C-alpha cells in the first residue's frame, strides 16, 4: 500500500482469514519494516485478545475480527488512510464511483 502511495507511515493495517485464524499486521510498524515473522495470529472466533506472535496485533483487531466473523465470504480486510480519501472526507465531499462495478454494487458515490 505504501509503495503505491495509498498509505503512509504506520497507519493502516491488513488482516487475512486462514481457516479459524486471523493473520493481522502488528500495531505501530511502518510498512517498509514489516516482515512475515512479525504478523500476529489470532483465533477469528475468540474475542479475548490472545495472539501468537512477537508483537501485539493492530489496535483495530476487533474491527477486523468482527468483519471476518460476520462475513464468511470475506477473506481479507484492508484498513488504510489514503491521502485522497482522507482529504475528501475532511472536506465532506463524496467520492464518485468512477468504475461501473462500484456503481453496480454500491451506487453512484462511495
Segments (PLM) and residue ranges:
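Glycine-rich flexible loops
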Residues: 1-110
Amino acid at each position: 500500500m505504501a509503495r503505491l502511495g495509498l498509505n503512509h507511515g504506520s497507519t493502516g493495517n491488513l488482516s487475512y482469514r486462514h481457516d479459524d485464524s486471523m493473520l493481522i499486521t502488528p500495531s505501530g510498524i511502518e510498512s517498509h519494516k514489516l516482515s512475515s515473522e512479525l504478523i500476529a495470529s489470532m483465533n477469528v472466533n475468540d474475542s479475548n485478545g490472545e495472539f501468537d506472535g512477537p508483537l501485539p496485533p493492530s489496535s483495530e483487531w476487533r474491527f477486523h475480527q468482527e468483519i471476518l466473523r460476520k462475513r464468511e465470504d470475506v477473506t481479507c480486510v484492508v484498513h488504510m488512510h489514503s491521502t485522497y480519501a482522507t482529504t475528501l472526507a475532511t472536506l465532506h465531499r463524496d467520492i464518485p464511483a468512477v468504475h461501473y462495478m462500484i456503481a453496480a454494487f454500491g451506487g453512484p458515490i462511495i
